[in-house]
């Protein structure tokens, strides 16, 4: 899973990037989410749907943490797998294929610092993850998958990482997806990529 890489990179870079700061103690909170699979809302879309963990609940937690610690002391990243798994994702994957993708707009509302692409985010194909990547770009959120490379020119398809500045501390956030994506899904979903 991407989470280990994100955490290790963030921790290592926080330490390395402190040289220009004044001596003192700096406390940053790193909040990671992932494997949401479309659980954006509190209940599924049915009369008998029961309450569940959701992006809404995560938003409440993050807002409380920011209020307690200070917004500039909280880093919020997601490890991917958000584009499949619910009626809401199905709607944006296959029914409304022209609107900006919803998850990046929700991530913008929550003020994510970066989002990595999970392997499930590729399964619905280019139409979904390319549209989501464009929506992330418009929302100003880095969408990361540094190990996804174009087969036609060998260039990276997505950003590898980003640097955020929190309370004067520069923190690098790196994002990688499952290296076996091409073997895990239909070839058309991952066409032109390796």
Predicted feature residues:
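Gram-negative bacterial Sec-dependent N-terminal signal peptides
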Residues: 2-19
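Acidic, metal/ion-coordinating pockets
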Residues: 19-194
């Amino acid at each position: 899973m991407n989470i280990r890489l994100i955490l290790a990179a963030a921790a290592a870079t926080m330490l390395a990037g402190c040289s220009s700061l004044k001596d003192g103690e700096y406390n940053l909170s790193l909040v990671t989410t992932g494997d949401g699979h479309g659980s954006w809302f509190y209940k599924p879309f049915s009369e008998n749907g029961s309450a569940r963990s959701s992006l809404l609940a995560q938003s409440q937690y993050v807002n409380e943490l920011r209020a307690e610690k200070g917004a500039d002391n909280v880093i919020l990243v997601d490890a991917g797998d958000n584009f499949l798994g619910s009626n809401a994702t199905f709607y944006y994957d296959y029914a409304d294929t022209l609107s900006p993708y919803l998850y990046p707009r929700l991530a913008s509302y929550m003020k994510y610092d970066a989002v990595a692409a999970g392997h499930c985010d590729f399964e619905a194909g280019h139409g979904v993850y390319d549209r989501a990547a464009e929506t992330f770009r418009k929302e100003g959120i880095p969408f990361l998958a540094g190990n996804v490379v174009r087969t036609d020119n060998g260039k990276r398809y997505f950003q590898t990482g980003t640097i955020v500045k929190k309370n004067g501390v520069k923190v690098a956030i790196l994002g990688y997806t499952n290296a076996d994506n091409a073997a895990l899904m239909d070839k058309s979903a991952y066409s032109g990529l390796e």
